[in-house]
Amino acid sequence: MDLIELQDIRKTYRLGEIDVPVLRGISLKVSPGDFVALMGTSGSGKTTLMNILGCLDRPTSGHYRFDGQDVVDLTPDQRAALRNRKIGFVFQNFNLLPRMSAVENVMMPLSYAGGGVSDQNGRERAGALLTRMGLGEHLDNEPSQLSGGQQQRVAIARALINNPSLLFADEPTGNLDSATSEEVLRVFQRLNEEEGVTIILVTHDPSVAQCARRIVRIRDGVIEPESGAVGDMPQVSKAAPAQSKPVHSAMRRGDLDKFRRSLHTALSSLRRNVLRAALTTLGIIIGVAAVIAMMEIGRGSSTAIQRTIASMGAHTLALLPGTAASGGVSFGGGSVMTMTPQDSEAIVNECPAVLAAAPIVRARTQVVHGSRNWVPAGIYGTTPTFLEIREWPLAEGDVFTERDVRNASKVCVLGQRLVDELFQGENPIGLEVRIKNVAFKVIGVLSPKGANMMGMDQDDLLLAPWTAIKYRVTGSSLANVNQSAASTSSASITDQVNSLSNLYPTEKVVLYPEISTTQAFDTPLPVRFTNVDQILVGIRSTSGTRAAIRQIGEVLRERHRLRPGEPDDFSVRDMTEMTKTLASTATMMTKLLLAVALISLIVGGVGIMNIMMVSVTERTREIGLRMAVGARAKNILQQFLFEAVLLCFLGGAVGILVGRGISHLVTVLLNWPTELSLDAILAAVGVSATVGIVFGYYPAWKASRLDPIVALRYE
């Protein structure tokens, strides 16, 4: 059976509206083991015929059978597979890839073999072929380190790596001197005579054609009658014709080998223009760095806001007294004193959603120690529960107790700002401060909290038992229950303060005793007995905020004897709403910054697309060579897409490092809170890959659509 059989092959190119015939009814047969010289002048059609014979092109009409298979109607991928398994090419210009060693150039067709071989087996086969070509000492040399003859022998070894049935040599001596040309021709003769390789040598030089056993002349697209075999050629040996050997399953390479080769090819491409690659990835680096830095700064800020809110009491509600009005004029919140310590106890006992509650009495006056004085932002009379609700630990010392509250003990706990202003480095524990000339012993110092969301210094305060502040500092007393009671009372304020122990008997502690209906009726609301300025409520969870507000409202309305339809004589401030608002604002700002960063990533992606388009143009000949040795369109697409993704990954990796560095510098230099964001890093990696795929696809697709013939001729 003939290896090649052509019947009436015609090829016509259309230039505008004109049809230009190049091949005019070519019929030809080539037997296995034959050595044919296809000779003709420039423009005779010999190169077009070789391209059709080598499955690089398709005829306009006619029939072509290769090794018994009709190849005219094969798809491009099927023709590529046929070229890879059964056809080898040797070109006039060698077409070796400059950044690859001799062994790597020879191994290139193995990358596209259907079965594939491992890197180790492929290297051994390539090394053996190069040794047969007399290049055993130049395996790792790049083409620039080899002579012209040596480069052509590397090209021959590459053509033989997959044991092809047919070897095409297109003007193989065109760029060589006479001595080297004879050396290369002897290699072809030896391959044909000793190994039975079928060779078609394309040339215009009669002296080169003489090395073949058969000369086929072509003129103006028509084959001239053959003159017979070359008479002075030695007899062909009895070696069996070369057969395309299938690759055994034991030699199959895995995905890891494919990945390694693709990675090596991509890195070799990037090494050609390191500076250009670095500048190309600059947009990706800036975008990823911005994403990382903004996410970490945003997350740190969000955490800081949450901590600030927590320090103010994220799980807290503030209950304020009602509003008095006269003549249509409102006197503002707290103008009617409707809250009592008893309300605080009732809320804790009767509201399941409430964890704790603390009454608060406020005072505004100066605090004196020695010759120094300071007016703190807040002087709060409360209970020890206040610090539990606020989750506020002590830096040193102790907090006052419920016994201190019962006894109106003159003890206090200071905030850090007040300590700094009054004691200036001196340890305040055990010392005294005076509030309205009442001496209070300092028993504890609060840990610093800093400013709250409104910018107020939370450390500028003094805490003491509410009974001490109310009865010893602000001047409220039992005598002031009402004016008439005061006029008939003979006890002084001091005596009544000292009689507080009678209100809190040690046998059975009733911190806030009930008052009778008569007392409640006779006592004007603005000065109701044991009224407080505020009640701080700690709820069990933010999800139970609405339930807590509803329960508190029901309890207080019942206690204050409010009829249905009457307005509340109290108000509730919900910190969770402020928390949600601030969190929403922080999230919005983070998204805005991320949008800016994503724009930078898009700009970087456009840069990737641009550089990949340039790379496709620069490597057009390489693409044609890879297609000639068996690369399918999807192989070219995958390779260039891999390079684009690798470029983005490298830019992303550098961007992650830069972003982390920026985040660290912001923390060190500006003292802004930042927090490591693994989500941002993973997102940056994902975005980098996505940018590489999206913006690298078109250049890769364009590369895969190149015509191998046009690509090989590209200058």
From Swiss-Prot:
Major site of localization recorded for this protein: membrane
Subcellular location: Cell inner membrane
GO cellular component, one term: plasma membrane
CDD domains: ABC_MJ0796_LolCDE_FtsE
Bilayer-crossing regions: 277-297, 592-612, 639-659, 681-701
Domain of life: Bacteria
Listed Pfam families: ABC_tran (PF00005), FtsX (PF02687), MacB_PCD (PF12704)
Ranges where the record places region Disordered: 229-251
SUPFAM superfamilies recorded: P-loop containing nucleoside triphosphate hydrolases (SSF52540)
Entry similarity comment: Belongs to the ABC transporter superfamily. Macrolide exporter (TC 3.A.1.122) family.
Protein function: Non-canonical ABC transporter that contains transmembrane domains (TMD), which form a pore in the inner membrane, and an ATP-binding domain (NBD), which is responsible for energy generation. Confers resistance against macrolides.
Subunit structure, interactors included: Homodimer.
PANTHER family: ABC TRANSPORTER PERMEASE YTRF (PTHR30572:SF4), MEMBRANE COMPONENT OF TRANSPORTER-RELATED (PTHR30572)
Name of the featured protein: Macrolide export ATP-binding/permease protein MacB
This protein's encoding gene: macB
